[in-house]
UniProtKB/Swiss-Prot annotation:
It comes from the Viruses. Keywords: Cap snatching, Eukaryotic host gene expression shutoff by virus, Eukaryotic host transcription shutoff by virus, Host gene expression shutoff by virus, Host mitochondrion, Host nucleus, Host-virus interaction, Inhibition of host innate immune response by virus, Inhibition of host MAVS by virus, Inhibition of host RLR pathway by virus, Inhibition of host RNA polymerase II by virus, mRNA capping, mRNA processing, Viral immunoevasion, Viral transcription, Virion. Its main location: virion. The keyword DNA repair does not apply. This is Polymerase basic protein 2. The keyword Acetylation does not apply. InterPro entries: Flu_PB2_2nd, Flu_PB2_6th, Flu_PB2_C, Flu_PB2_CAP-bd, Flu_PB2_middle, Flu_PB2_N, INV_PB2, PB2_helical. GO terms for biological process: 7-methylguanosine mRNA capping; cap snatching; DNA-templated transcription; symbiont-mediated suppression of host cytoplasmic pattern recognition receptor signaling pathway via inhibition of MAVS activity; symbiont-mediated suppression of host gene expression; symbiont-mediated suppression of host mRNA transcription via inhibition of RNA polymerase II activity; viral RNA genome replication. Influenza RNA polymerase is composed of three subunits: PB1, PB2 and PA. Interacts (via N-terminus) with PB1 (via C-terminus). Interacts with nucleoprotein NP (via N-terminus). Interacts (via N-terminus) with host MAVS (via N-terminus); this interaction inhibits host innate immune response. Belongs to the influenza viruses PB2 family. The gene is PB2. It is found in: Virion; Host nucleus; Host mitochondrion.
């Protein structure tokens, strides 16, 4: 107070004011401090000081033609003195006010296009719903979140090329637009921004917001998709939260969500096929999400989720170095260990071979609904500090940590045999056996763990075996905390390898991920996932397998037909028939296959018995490894709609129905496409059909020249003879009939004569 009085006193003397306004500041250190570098050292002071001047703004000379010298109140809007050091005009803030009221209005058509992200945000907020505010302790944990809704997923480099091409097309510099998305966006934006008068720099900034994913490491409790993050400041404080329902979705969140679902489906499906890695790659390459190739999305999208990371590893992309166990992401924060195989006995005296981690290590564990800090030594849990949304989530984290610790009391708590299998019916590895066992029922585990007295520590409570909190006692080494554990913040990615069973390892050989870690949660994708791979037909159940298998045969009929006659073994091994096998009762698969293959062989041997519909109908059954038996079948069973349904070997059935008149095939009542039979096949065998109007004279006769194809026969004159190539590469001598009347009888006699001629 005293100093202020003193200063006021000084300022009231005219001499002080004179000294302060006229004396030069010539202390070099001060001048250096405030003038070196372009960075403003005291922005708020600078702003206040500038705004106190009469003309704090400079503008281009053109302003003198666009803004009057004085406004209606007679105040000067710009100075006739030009700005020192440039040929610009010094302008008063009042000129801005005048312009806002009276300045010319430009064409606004480009504003919503350039500032699209802002306009969209306003719409989302307008249609969003804010609910009540609740006061409660917020367990926030820092997670890496997307803060920029509505963006494409281009890399910074790709985006830079697009922006340069759109905004500064005439600038020098090599720009290579390669990816599908780059080309589409460039074309779209050039179109939208034609004749745009908004400053190019501003357009470039706004384009960057639209094209690139921006992430921040922020404390979050609740939704992490970008449309929730944009209102984070409105929905959660230190001790309160406000309910909010967004007023619209954005494509980037939809892509992230659909990518996770697609990746999970693929990994689950690949795990049960003969060569999981090859199948997984085939599916990733043939699948589209919302019209974009899945492999392109995987290359650009930084989503970290177990299934997504397995797909990335298979494609040779780098992934995060953290590993996954029991649905939690583990990141080692200190310590180290060596691995050693050890045999242990369960409470049921079953021997398990486990890889023991020897050494002291600390980990953070981050799951969807709980997080923890784990300190462990060799086969011993030293301390576990958990926080989670509810009792259930906390219990899940405790079970995972107890199993991960490999403590003896955990292994001894096993009751009964461990024989869990994966989707491919293979036994799980011992650690996952233990995990599954205790996830089903952890009562014995918690009871046997042991209890200790605890000291009261701020923000921490004990937890008893029945999951009730306590301030006196707790399960040994385990505490529940009010504070969450932050997710691992680094975006560092490491090179990994993947084996054919989809186990992902880092360069030291530690397993980071395996199909067992992929969540079984089912969800509905927000963007259409197009599975063009036959492996994914069963995603939508048995009916889909049936329809897709037959549709595939019809679509590829030309190639299938040739393979059927020339290389059946290769045809039977096609992966497109693999899903179908799951519909055929296991016990009889081999017999069906043997029966159908024999039938097909007879068709090949006996001319004139080729039957398109029947081949298509029975072909999928021939794909199973055949068992030779003398059994004959008049119908074959497939398991669809919860029961066995019959496909008739000869004739139509509800499962497979071919309408000769309309040429349409219906499978289970659903249209499966048009089936074009070979010409005239319907009335008789293919050979006799094409030999109508010809008389078969006998075996090939070289005097009549090289064998013609059936199509070349039409050029023969009546009574002319020729050798003809028929059916399975056999050649016979024919003569074109002189009369048309007897054509009908040819069909019957041709078949007999061909056989005689060949034999």
């Amino acid at each position: 107070m005293e100093r202020i009085k003193e200063l006021r006193n000084l300022m009231s003397q005219s001499r002080t004011r004179g000294i302060l306004t006229k004396t030069t500041v010539d202390h070099m250190a001060i001048i250096k401090k405030y003038t070196s570098g372009r960075q403003e050292k005291n922005p708020s002071l600078r702003m206040k000081w500038m705004m106190a001047m009469k003309y704090p703004i400079t503008a281009d000379k053109r302003i003198t033609e666009m803004v009057p010298e004085r406004n209606e109140q007679g105040q000067t809007l710009w100075s006739k003195m030009s700005d020192a050091g440039s040929d610009r005009v010094m302008v008063s803030p009042l000129a801005v006010t005048w312009w806002n009221r009276n300045g010319q209005v430009t064409n606004t058509v480009h504003y919503p296009k350039v500032y699209k992200t802002y306009f969209d945000k306003v719409e989302r907020l307008k249609h969003g719903t804010f609910g009540p505010v609740h006061f409660r302790n917020q367990v926030k944990i820092r997670r890496r979140v997307d803060i920029n809704p509505g963006h494409a997923d281009l890399s910074a480099k790709e985006a830079k090329d697009v922006i340069m091409e759109v905004v500064f097309p005439n600038e020098v510099g090599a720009r290579i637009l390669t990816s599908e998305s780059q080309l589409t966006i460039t074309k779209e934006k050039k179109e939208e921004l034609r004749d745009c008068k908004i400053s190019p720099l501003m357009v470039a900034y706004m384009l960057e917001r639209e094209l690139v994913r921006k992430t921040r490491f922020l404390p979050v409790a609740g939704g992490t998709s970008s449309i929730y993050i944009e209102v984070l400041h409105l929905t959660q404080g230190t001790c309160w939260e406000q309910m909010y329902t967004p007023g619209g979705e954005v494509r980037n969140d939809d892509v992230d969500q659909s990518l996770i679902i697609a990746a999970r489906n693929i990994v689950r499906r690949a795990a049960v096929s003969a060569d999981p890695l090859a199948s997984l790659l085939e599916m990733c390459h043939s699948q589209q999400i919302g019209g974009t190739r899945m492999v392109d999305i995987l290359r650009q999208n930084p989503t970290e989720e177990q299934a997504v990371d397995i797909c990335k590893a298979a494609m040779g992309l780098r992934i995060s170095s953290s590993f996954s166990f029991g649905g939690f992401t583990f990141k080692r924060t200190s310590g180290s260990s060596i691995k050693r195989e050890e045999e242990v006995l369960t409470g049921n005296l079953q021997t398990l071979k486990i890889r023991v981690h020897e050494g002291y290590e600390e980990f953070t564990m981050v799951g969807k609904r709980a997080t923890a800090i784990l300190r462990k030594a060799t086969r011993r849990l030293v301390q576990l500090i958990v926080s989670g949304r509810d009792e259930q989530s906390i219990a899940e984290a405790i079970i995972v940590a107890m199993v991960f610790s490999q403590e003896d009391c955990m292994i001894k708590a096993v009751r009964g045999d461990l024989n869990f299998v994966n989707r491919a019916n293979q036994r799980l590895n011992p650690m996952h056996q233990l995990l599954r066992h205790f996830q089903k029922d952890a009562k014995v585990l918690f009871q046997n763990w042991g209890i200790e007295h605890i000291d009261s520590v701020m923000g921490m409570v004990g937890v008893l075996p029945d999951m009730t909190p306590s301030t006196e006692m707790s399960m040994r080494g385990i505490r529940v905390s009010k504070m969450g554990v932050d997710e691992y913040s680094s975006t560092e990615r490491v090179v990994v390898s993947i084996d054919r069973f989809l186990r992902v390892r880092d360069q030291r050989g530690n397993v980071l991920l395996s199909p067992e870690e992929v969540s079984e949660t089912q969800g509905t994708e927000r963007l259409t996932i197009t599975y063009s791979s036959s492996m994914m037909w069963e995603i939508n159940g048995p009916e889909s397998v049936l329809v897709n298998t037959y549709q595939w045969i019809i679509r590829n009929w030309e190639t299938v037909k040739i393979q059927w006659s020339q290389n059946p073994a290769m045809l039977y091994n096609k992966m497109e028939f693999e899903p179908f096998q799951s519909l055929v009762p296991k016990a009889i698969r081999g017999q069906y296959s043997g029966f159908v293959r024999t039938l097909f062989q007879q068709m090949r041997d006996v001319l004139g018995t080729f039957d398109t519909t029947q081949i298509i109908k029975l072909l999928p059954f021939a794909a199973a490894p055949p068992k030779q038996s003398r059994m004959q079948f008049s119908s074959l069973t497939v398991n669809v709609r919860g029961s066995g349904m019959r496909i008739l070997v000869r004739g139509n059935s509800p499962v497979f129905n071919y309408n000769k008149t309309t040429k349409r095939l219906t499978i289970l009542g659903k249209d499966a496409g048009t089936l074009i039979e070979d010409p005239d096949e319907s009335t008789s065998g293919v050979e006799s059909a094409v030999l109508r109007g010809f008389l078969i004279l006998g075996k090939e006769d070289r005097r009549y020249g090289p064998a013609l194809s059936i199509n070349e026969l039409s050029n023969l004159a009546k009574g002319e003879k020729a050798n003809v190539l028929i059916g399975q590469g056999d050649v016979v001598l024919v003569m074109k009939r002189k009369r048309d009347s007897s054509i009908l009888t040819d069909s019957q006699t041709a078949t007999k004569r061909i056989r005689m001629a060949i034999n």
